């Protein structure tokens, strides 16, 4: 009876202050969020966030500065407009904006809810200096499509990231949601979805794609995979892409073996029209889904291969960092993040697996695998090869480290290749990077983080003293990796060979380019290896074509010349007029048979049986 009397008295007191909401304090109350995707005003969506009761006079509300998996400062608060806070009577409270992502609400004890409008990122990517990477961005296209990366729509109150969220989304009845969030409204109401998240991280970890229903589902070793496709011009259907995804993900599960994984996985594929649309192509991983953005204009063969390469990388993130990760990720601070030292693992291991599984499962040939690894070596040269990978990782949001982020996919892969070969060599083929991640996953899993500074020591204790030397020199330290040392263990080596090319391109790689800022002038590309035809005739990087065999060169006139060149006889005399440093030059020479020098990974001449055996277990498992 005393408790009842106490709550009655407190209720009367709160009502006298104008309160009409539950007296549950904010830290014990579910946060209720409403998104209105029907009444879209000027390409903006209205969001309301309704917490429990506060006692503090000052309340802080945040929209994320950055989110896990992006490793960049994106300031999603810049896309928030008309932010307001209301008391229990509906009157506005005083609000000040502290920075791009923080709002300070005074008289917090009277706070009922906040509301604001969200602008999307896709159609403004070309207008801003540092655009949000499209797979982590947002799209608002009234009645047609909504890409809800929820960190761009839903914010959080200081100290309340661990309380549950209920998301009520009013949407056009003709659009269907694809997401891994669980619905709570057992009795469906047309045009209304209600989702539950156990904490704020779960909100940000579960994007939602609203589009006209185009979903293909399939089962892979106990996982239900849903492929949802938004193709604005109807060029692609989920059903047409399903088979390749099934084959790829089946191979991934076979490669992973008994690693614990999700029961459901959603692939949200957004195909961009390019103009005033998403232009950052790739994907962003989540525990049970991934957002993929690719151009709709790609032909199906290239689109499917891009999906294989991108989605396989994202799916492998279920191993790391979604399972094996540090405290910095488990307790991620969305507005003052402390970054982990181990991007060599989170992104490097994942990208390595995304290539290794394809050779192990027979999706690509050995030659294709070597070409991919060689490509990583060449691409890694664009970055600082003496930069400590762990120092770069923990400072990845800052200069000069952030400009080297792309190297996590290049040298990060190569670090894992060298580590993998070393483990195979020291264990007579028994241990590998995959074995290592499985062991770490058994110990930690998604609920138990490791201590950032202890990981390398733990890996050494699980393996061999030589692994400590490797990390000290090549991951923590600044010593570049001698890749030949590791390739030689499996009977391979780096070398240069001559390969036949076309006169103007090798495969899909052209030796020429177009300067759109200079009337589409056609010029010789710089800083690439030119073929023997270009070299022999005297062409140099930066030369601007004026004519070929008397034909004035424009982008339009060059296309048929390239087509005709495939039939040129070797003794044909070719005359090319170019502009070089303001001077017109006439260059003449025979067509010949064009070849280009190519860096390759190739088999050594005197390979031992032991090296072949180690190569077999490395590449075939």
Which sequence ranges carry the predicted segments?
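N-terminal, post-signal-peptide region of Sec/Tat-exported proteins
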Residues: 52-88
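Early extracytoplasmic/domain-onset interaction patches
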Residues: 23-66, 147-152
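An active-site-proximal "capping" alpha-helix that borders the catalytic cofactor pocket
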Residues: 83, 252, 345-357, 576
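C-terminal motif of bacterial Sec signal peptides marking the signal peptidase cleavage site
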Residues: 15-16
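C-terminal recognition in membrane/secretory proteostasis and scaffolding
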Residues: 354-355, 363-621
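Non-catalytic architectural context of zinc metalloproteases
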Residues: 73-82, 86-262, 281-282
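Juxtacatalytic substrate-recognition/specificity segment
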Residues: 49, 214-342
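Positively charged n-region of N-terminal signal peptides that target proteins for export
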Residues: 1-4
